[in-house]
Design a protein with these regions (language model features):
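N-terminal leader/targeting segments and the immediately adjacent pre-domain N-terminus
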Residues: 1-7, 23-31, 60, 113-114, ...
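Short active-site loop at a secondary-structure junction
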Residues: 1-57, 89-103, 179-182, 303
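Short, well-ordered beta-strand elements
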Residues: 282, 293-313
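Short, glycine-/Ser/Thr-/acidic-enriched flexible segments
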Residues: 275, 288-290, 311-314
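A short acidic/glycine-rich loop-to-helix N-cap element
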Residues: 312-325
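Short, surface-exposed loop or secondary-structure junction motifs
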Residues: 47-286
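Short, well-ordered loop/turn and helix-capping segments at boundaries between secondary-structure elements
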Residues: 64, 134, 200, 204, ...
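Short, flexible turn/loop "capping" segments at secondary-structure junctions
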Residues: 1, 170-175, 299-302
């Protein structure tokens, strides 16, 4: 594997969906606090609560949805959401009822599709990946086969390249729903570009190079060369999210105590911990599926960030609730960066 090998990043995919949600909020396409029925129809509601679930409650895992299996299909999802049995008797947004929900991300991503009137994949490509020059997708079958990593568990192949390429490419709203909780495929380099947008308050900074042409001489036998030289402290800046939207993503809502590891603050999809990996504060998300263990972190103070994607490692977690190998590598990388910006 290299920094450009494309890996299914598992639950870090949720951060990508969250960034799309905030971009749509910037554009006025979606209201984070509107009831889901505004997008799904009046039959979609929690009949046990006066307060109704919203995009914001989906992003804090407090939507009041029960723990249903990951699924897809617009009519199927709408049917589920219209059933009283799909909902818990709780007030959406209440952190005391926090429950990490992959099914909730199926609903969140499809809500965004209904809001923009198209596939979230297309929105993501247009608003983030193309401006970043990133080759990544929720549809791994659309990527170059030679760039995909086979996913390994400690016992063998978790998901082969052939299996990843055999996925069908959705063409209708709702068909991608099962991909949103964990199906985004990207290289560490391209995932780091997305993390850099968050670390830099919504702006991506592309380093600027200047070309220097080497003149032909007798010694070079008429061959002319060009070298690229990095221009110090020069960047091309592209704003992809408003600073207000990044601030909203980073806003802690309540503290979750997993019992088996340190408590963390739940933000909009992102998590927050202080005094972690040698940093004063980090926003982060983990990912685990089919033998992949992954970690995306960034420090809003130094604007440094690290993305680690692994496959084939044993499942070990540290006392912070992070996958141990990812955490160890991340801490070493933060030490090396020593305050340099992303």
């Amino acid at each position: 594997m290299t920094p450009d090998t494309k890996v299914r990043v598992a639950s870090i995919s949720k951060v990508v969906v969250a960034m799309c949600a905030m971009s749509m909020a910037d554009e006025g396409l979606i209201d984070l606090d509107a009831p889901l029925s505004d997008y799904w129809g009046s039959g979609v509601r929690n009949s046990y609560s006066e307060v109704q679930p919203s995009v914001r409650t989906l992003m804090t895992h407090t939507s009041s949805l029960r723990n249903l299996e990951i699924t897809r299909g617009l009519s199927h999802l709408r049917g589920l959401l219209q059933r009283p049995s799909t909902w818990r008797s709780m007030e959406p947004g209440n952190g005391g009822y926090w429950y990490y929900s992959n099914f909730g991300l199926c609903v969140l991503g499809t809500t965004l599709e209904l809001a923009c009137g198209g596939l979230l994949e297309n929105y993501l490509q247009e608003h983030f990946l193309q401006p970043l020059g990133a080759s990544a997708s929720f549809y791994s079958e659309t990527l170059e086969v030679g760039q995909l990593a086979a996913l390994y568990t400690t016992g063998g192949v978790g998901r082969s390249v052939a299996e990843q390429m055999a996925q069908t490419t959705p063409t209708q709203i709702g068909q991608t729903a099962s991909y949103f909780p964990g199906g985004f495929t990207a290289s560490a380099r391209d995932m780091a570009k997305l993390a850099a947008v968050l670390a830099n308050d919504g702006v991506y900074k592309e380093p600027v190079y200047r070309s220097i042409e080497l003149e032909s001489t007798q010694d070079t036998h008429g061959i002319v060369g060009v070298i690229l030289q990095l221009m110090e402290n020069r960047y091309t800046e592209t704003r992809l999210l408003s600073a207000e939207s990044v601030e909203a993503l980073e806003q802690p809502y309540f503290t979750v105590d997993p019992i088996t590891s340190s408590p963390f603050q739940q933000c909009l999809i992102l998590r927050r911990q202080e005094d972690i990996l040698g940093q004063n504060v980090l926003y982060y998300h983990t990912g685990s599926a089919y033998g992949v263990f992954a970690l995306m972190t960034y420090n809003p103070e130094t604007r440094n960030g690290v993305v680690v994607l692994t496959t084939g490692a044993p499942r070990n977690t540290d006392d912070r609730g992070l996958y141990a190998l990812c955490a160890d590598l991340s801490e070493k990388l933060y030490e090396k960066m020593d305050g340099d910006p992303v």
